[in-house]
Amino acid sequence: WLPKQCSKHKWAPKTYQSNLALIQNLIIPYIGEMQMQKLRPYHIEALYDTLSKTPCGQYVGGKRRDLSPKQQKRTLSGTTLHEVHQLLHNSFLLAVEWGILIKSPVPVEAPKKTTQERSIWEVEEMRAALDSMEDPILHLAVHLTLVGALREGEVAGLTPEDIDFDAANGMGTFTVNRSMQRVQKDTLAQVDKGCILRIFPDKLEGSKTSLILKDTKTEASCRTIFMTAALREELKQWLERLKREEALDPERYRNSGMLLRLPNGLAVEPVLIRKKFLKWQDAHPEFPRIVFHGLRHSSATYQLMI
């Protein structure tokens, strides 16, 4: 069922990987041995009740893990339960359509999503945070995110060709139309390759994952963003820095072609941006703690001040 749906709806790699994880870790361990025709709504309701008390990460890759007392306290969210419901709803609806079942056992009412208010920074906190970031990769990633409300993958997916310093009467713009992700190689074998623009070479032999560059989610995700004067200057300096780093050792420089690169030319992955941000937060407890994605929500406030 999963590969067929993936092909039919042209799922992105992350979508396939996420749905596969839901099936392996939250559905099969609990109702996987039951006959489909014997499932009733109360079985599904019982599953939701069990999952609501289940610790995050209890199963990984379909295998049960031993968790510490601290890990056992963090249970699955209502949003995750809602995702399980949607997956079951769609799969059993198809079973009815295919004539395998007469009626779907999935209850009409879905578990309620968990809504959490995201923390954002105030204007002065954003200014002070940028001033305190000495890591040039992190500084540029955060600056781009605050100006353009970018996701981590979109920041990592930018290339020098996306930057136009002459656009908008010299104000400058940058275009967002790609996203970088690391996905399981098994996933790549199942998904539509049409959305994948590039698969990066493996850093380690025998790696089970691949770093890819893909189209952004929707046409609305493709956008052109005006630069601020400060970002324009930082981008100019950054591109000069890339040229200098390549000139130091051109034979060993591994030019990934991405905007954000390590000194050796390799692409900066989204997870590295996240780790750098966490490291900075640990070193600066005076700032309200937010996840990197929270910077995207702080972007609207930042844009009002420029």
What are these language model-derived features?
Residues 45, 109, 118, 122, ...:
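Residue-level detector of conserved, well-ordered beta-strand and adjacent loop positions
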